[in-house]
Amino acid sequence: MLLSPIEAQILSQYQLLAVQLNTLSSEVKQLNSTTNQNSRPSGKSSSSEDGVEATNSGSADKLLDNLRNLEMKIGLVYTLFKGAVYSLFLQYEEDQNLKNDEEQRRNDDSDEEPQNHHEIDAIEGENNDDMGDRMESQENHGH
């Protein structure tokens, strides 16, 4: 059975993750052993050395737990940040749409006003023509 390219890529990513986790685990063990060697007091019995080793091991485990908690919190902050940025983009787009709609309304209103003025001018022109015709007819009748 052959793997699709995406399946092969996913498996290689899992393999890389496993290698990194193994490396991290070995580094933590090395850190624990270095810490244990540096903190062992000389002249103590082996029973007290075991207690110090357990304490140092516990400190490293607490450190790892704290790092895991920090990683989860950073992930949550990142998710919230992405949501906030997305919200800002949506709000900006909505504001731009409202501005464009307002400009369109203004343009439509300004396009309608000259038409009304032309209609008024045309009506006034007809009235003026009628008055001019009346004046001419009165002058002609008057003479």
UniProtKB/Swiss-Prot annotation:
Name-wise, this protein is: DASH complex subunit DAD3
Q: Where is this region: Disordered?
A: 32-62, 96-143
Where is this chain compositionally biased, Basic and acidic residues type?
Answer: 96-121, 131-143
Keyword Cytoplasm in the entry? The reply is yes
**PANTHER family named among the record's database cross-references:** DASH COMPLEX SUBUNIT DAD3
Q: GO MF terms on file?
A: microtubule plus-end binding
Name a biological process GO annotation.
Answer: attachment of spindle microtubules to kinetochore
Organism lineage string: Eukaryota, Fungi, Dikarya, Ascomycota, Saccharomycotina
Matching InterPro entries, A to Z?
DASH_Dad3
Top-level taxon of origin: Eukaryota
Which family is annotated?
Answer: Belongs to the DASH complex DAD3 family.
Tell me the compartments it is located in.
Answer: Nucleus; Cytoplasm, Cytoskeleton, Spindle; Chromosome, Centromere, Kinetochore
Subunit structure, per the record?
Answer: Component of the DASH complex consisting of ASK1, DAD1, DAD2, DAD3, DAD4, DAM1, DUO1, HSK3, SPC19 and SPC34, with a stoichiometry of one copy of each subunit per complex. Multiple DASH complexes oligomerize to form a ring that encircles spindle microtubules and organizes the rod-like NDC80 complexes of the outer kinetochore. DASH complex oligomerization strengthens microtubule attachments. On cytoplasmic microtubules, DASH complexes appear to form patches instead of rings.
Q: Where are the transmembrane segments?
A: none
- Which keywords has UniProt assigned to this entry? Cell cycle, Cell division, Centromere, Chromosome, Chromosome partition, Cytoplasm, Cytoskeleton, Kinetochore, Microtubule, Mitosis, Nucleus
Give the record's GO CC terms: cytoplasm; DASH complex; microtubule; mitotic spindle
Q: Which gene encodes it?
A: DAD3
* UniProt function note: Component of the DASH complex that connects microtubules with kinetochores and couples microtubule depolymerisation to chromosome movement; it is involved in retrieving kinetochores to the spindle poles before their re-orientation on the spindle in early mitosis and allows microtubule depolymerization to pull chromosomes apart and resist detachment during anaphase.
UniProt-listed Pfam families? DASH_Dad3
